[in-house]
Each structure stands twice: as C-alpha cells, then as structure tokens.
C-alpha cells in the first residue's frame, strides 16, 4: 500500500510510467486529484485525467489531517518552504500510515514518512 504523489500520476497519465500494481492498494486524496485536474489543457485531457485517477481509492481529508498539516506548516514552512499541498499530502501519509511514492523526495525527506 502506498500514497501516490501527483508527480507519479502525471507520468502514469501521460504514459511514461506504467503502474502494474493493484491500484486498489495505491491511494490518493482530493489534493492530489485537484493538482492533476488543474493541469488539464482541454476537455479531452480533463476526461483522460478523471478516468485514470478514478482507478485509485480516494482517502478522506479529515480534521485530524488538517490539524497535523497546520502543525507541519508552522514547523517547516520557513525552514523548508513547505507548501500547503505537501503538508496535507504528508499529513495524509502520517495519519493513514502509508509510504509516499514521489519523485520529489527533497520535499518530504525531513519528515517521518516512508518514501518510495
């Protein structure tokens, strides 16, 4: 089981990264979903994005995740330039106890989460 960062899904959607694993064990949240949707260039692109990301279970972003993301931002925004998106993704990984599959390891290496 893993949490997928948007950078991994961008390569998957564009055909640069096959994902052969059981997609029911690869999770996203609405932050990742929105990061992908905002990158759509036209209606066809948007339809492709929505079709491909619908294969992955969507984890809820609850108050515990938002509270933890606020703590992470207070601690790491100035020292590591943490974004709100990365804070919510990291908090989701921590709360759901999932490693993060990302190319952007530098954005998360200072946190107590597994990186793939």
Predicted regions, residues:
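Short, well-structured N-terminal submotif of metal-dependent ribonuclease cores
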Residues: 1-32, 37-51
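Short loop->beta-strand "edge-of-pocket" segments that line small-molecule binding or catalytic clefts
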Residues: 2, 25-27, 55-60, 99
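Residue-level signal for functionally critical sites in structured catalytic/ligand-binding pockets
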Residues: 35-38, 44-46, 73-74, 83, ...
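Ligand-binding grooves and catalytic loops that recognize ribose/phosphate and carbohydrate rings
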Residues: 42-56, 64, 69
């Amino acid at each position: 089981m893993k949490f997928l960062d948007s950078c991994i899904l961008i390569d998957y959607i564009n055909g640069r990264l096959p994902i052969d694993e059981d997609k029911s064990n690869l999770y996203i949240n609405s932050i990742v979903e929105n990061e992908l949707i905002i990158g759509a260039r036209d209606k066809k692109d948007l339809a492709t994005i929505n079709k491909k990301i619908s294969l992955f279970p969507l984890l809820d972003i609850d108050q515990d995740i938002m509270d933890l993301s606020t703590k992470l931002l207070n601690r790491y925004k100035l020292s590591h330039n943490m974004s709100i998106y990365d804070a919510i993704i990291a908090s989701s990984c921590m709360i759901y106890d999932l490693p993060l599959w990302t190319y952007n390891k530098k954005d998360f290496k200072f946190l107590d989460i597994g990186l793939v």
